[in-house]
Structures are given as structure tokens and as C-alpha cells.
């Protein structure tokens, strides 16, 4: 980020993906140790087939205020521990990223576009653009259906796509699964960018340059 023209923007949360291929019973043990040490007073799980877990209100301020997990491999957390969680309906306000990564095509895209920086695995800017674009479409559709969706969240994902575009070179192109590539084509059709939008975000590129850049990135 320090090598890009983007201004620094602090985040309120961290989106962390646990790769199922690397999870072990030992990880599950360490995870529950973390939850118990944090003294999380509210421990919940979804009562449907999609496995969602939420931990809130830790007794120590040194621990995250809330942890949300969408598990593709729930058995790693241990059946005995999971039985003690309070069943809840699948929340409407779950992380859009969590829901997206239940899709095998998006999950494989993520795995193919991760890099290591100082020992930490991160997603490339172009992969983040794909996830942000998908999240923007999903939240926009839910809002149109009358579901409770914060307009600020919808706008944030769209603005993040525009900000991240400043980190993409014109000759960059991704190899995407067909399903993902087709959905990115839909995103481009729905996306509108004005000069005022870019000025507010401090982006110097022209609106048509952004569209062309994203079209080339997605192979469209």
C-alpha cells in the first residue's frame, strides 16, 4: 500500500479466511482456548445447514469484540464444543465475504490469488476487487428485495473497488473461473462511475479509464 497513491484508511474489522486445507484438530483446540480465555459471554451457532458461528461480549478488552465464522469444515472445531453454543437463525447481517466464500468458485479464486508478505498470507488487490464487486452486487440485490441492508455498506464496497483500481496496471488480467468471470461481466454492466465519484475518493483516473481497466482485468 505504501507504494500506491492511495491515502491510508483505518479499518474497523479484519476479514480473515481460514483455509480448510490447512485446518487441523490442533487448530480447533487452540481456537477454543482463545475463545475461553477471552471469556466470550455470547456463543451462538446457526440452526440451519449453513454453519455460522458468532462469539460476542468478551470479558477482556484485549480480545476482539466479536468473532464471526462461516465454516466450510465445521468438524475441525469439535462436536463437543459446538453442542454448547446457543442455536440462532442464520443472521441477516452476516459478513458478505463469509457468504461469498461458501461458493467453491470464489474460494478457488481466492486461493489462486494470495501472496505472502512478512509471513502473512494476503489477497492481491485484483482478488479483493472481485470480492468487493460480488459483495456490492449481493448487497444491492438484497436491498432491492426489501431486506435490511445498510446503504453505507453498499456504497463502501463500490468505493473500495474504485480505490483498489488505482493499484491495477492497464495490462493486468486475471484467470477467473467461468462463473466468476460471468458475474464480473454483470458487475461491469451495472457499474456507473462519475468524475465526481472519483474526485471524492482522490482518484485521478477518468471514469472511462476505470471501466476499461476493470474490463481488461476481468478478461471482458
List the predicted regions and their residue ranges:
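Compositionally biased terminal segments of proteins
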Residues: 1-220
Amino acid at each position: 500500500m505504501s507504494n500506491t497513491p492511495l491515502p491510508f484508511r483505518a479499518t474497523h474489522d479484519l476479514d480473515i479466511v481460514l483455509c480448510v486445507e490447512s485446518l487441523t484438530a490442533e487448530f480447533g483446540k487452540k481456537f477454543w482456548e482463545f475463545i475461553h480465555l477471552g471469556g466470550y459471554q455470547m456463543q451462538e451457532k446457526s440452526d440451519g445447514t449453513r454453519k455460522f458461528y458468532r462469539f460476542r461480549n468478551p470479558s477482556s478488552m484485549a480480545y476482539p469484540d466479536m468473532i464471526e465464522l462461516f465454516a466450510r469444515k465445521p468438524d475441525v472445531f469439535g462436536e463437543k464444543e459446538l453442542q454448547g453454543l446457543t442455536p440462532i437463525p442464520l443472521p441477516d447481517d452476516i459478513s458478505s465475504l463469509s457468504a461469498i466464500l461458501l461458493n467453491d468458485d470464489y474460494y478457488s479464486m481466492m486461493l489462486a490469488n494470495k501472496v505472502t508478505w512478512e509471513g502473512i498470507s494476503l489477497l492481491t488487490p485484483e482478488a479483493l476487487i472481485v470480492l468487493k464487486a460480488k459483495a456490492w452486487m449481493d448487497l444491492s440485490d438484497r436491498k432491492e428485495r426489501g431486506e435490511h441492508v445498510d446503504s453505507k455498506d453498499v456504497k463502501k464496497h463500490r468505493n473500495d473497488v474504485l480505490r483498489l483500481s488505482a493499484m491495477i496496471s492497464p495490462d493486468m488480467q486475471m484467470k477467473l473461473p467461468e462463473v466468476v468471470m460471468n458475474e464480473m461481466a454483470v458487475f461491469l454492466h451495472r457499474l456507473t462511475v462519475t468524475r465526481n465519484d472519483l474526485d471524492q475518493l482522490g482518484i485521478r483516473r477518468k471514469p472511462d479509464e476505470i471501466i476499461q481497466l476493470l474490463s481488461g482485468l476481468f478478461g471482458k
